[in-house]
Amino acid sequence: MRIRLVTVGKVKEKYLQDGVQEYLKRLRPYARVEIVTVPDEPIPDGASPAQEAQVMQREGERLLRALDQGGQEHVVVLDGRGKNFSSEELAAFLAERALHGDANLAFVIGGSLGLDPAVLARAGTTLSLGRMTFLHQMVPLILLEQIYRAFKINRGEKYHK
């Protein structure tokens, strides 16, 4: 299985970078996982809704260019309006994708303002991490941990409780 996290902006905090690297290492026996980062767009102070929409559009264009243009990836966008999966449901989702030959996944994480409608339209699946709001830079770490947990669940290995 090949999994890509396609995200806007780099993780800047060292403790989060360390966590991301740890889970990338833990995932190596289960899947090829990579993180593709596109630059974030500066948000002007006191940005108007139109300026915010323009920021999301520019970031969205970058995200779409980073996705597999051949349609070989199942695109999963993270959005607060998406489906809430339990860890077991995420494990079942990954297993189902692999079973049906859809083993290339791209999880798309938008910028701090969210995702442009064009990116949302590209989604095969829309996933929510829940109703809480997370620091944007934490999302890759949280997602990687959940993907790791899902692989452990699917293999019946000790980790998930």
UniProtKB/Swiss-Prot annotation:
Q: What positions does the entry give for S-adenosyl-L-methionine binding?
A: L78, G110, L129, G130, R131, M132, T133, F134
Enzyme Commission designation: 2.1.1.177
- For the keyword Cytoplasm, the answer is yes
Write down any Gene Ontology CC term.
Answer: cytoplasm
A Gene Ontology molecular function term for this protein is: rRNA (pseudouridine-N3-)-methyltransferase activity
Please tell me whether the keyword tRNA-binding is annotated for this protein: no
Q: Which reaction does it catalyse?
A: pseudouridine(1915) in 23S rRNA + S-adenosyl-L-methionine = N(3)-methylpseudouridine(1915) in 23S rRNA + S-adenosyl-L-homocysteine + H(+)
* Main EC class the enzyme belongs to: transferase
What keywords are assigned to this protein? Cytoplasm, Methyltransferase, rRNA processing, S-adenosyl-L-methionine, Transferase
- Any idea what job this protein has? Specifically methylates the pseudouridine at position 1915 (m3Psi1915) in 23S rRNA.
The record's annotation in NCBIfam families points to: PRK00103.1-3
The UniProt similarity line reads: Belongs to the RNA methyltransferase RlmH family.
The record's note on quaternary structure and interaction partners says: Homodimer.
Q: What is this protein called?
A: Ribosomal RNA large subunit methyltransferase H
Q: Which species is the source of this protein?
A: Symbiobacterium thermophilum (strain DSM 24528 / JCM 14929 / IAM 14863 / T)
Q: What high-level taxonomic lineage is stated for the organism? A: Bacteria, Bacillati, Bacillota, Clostridia, Eubacteriales
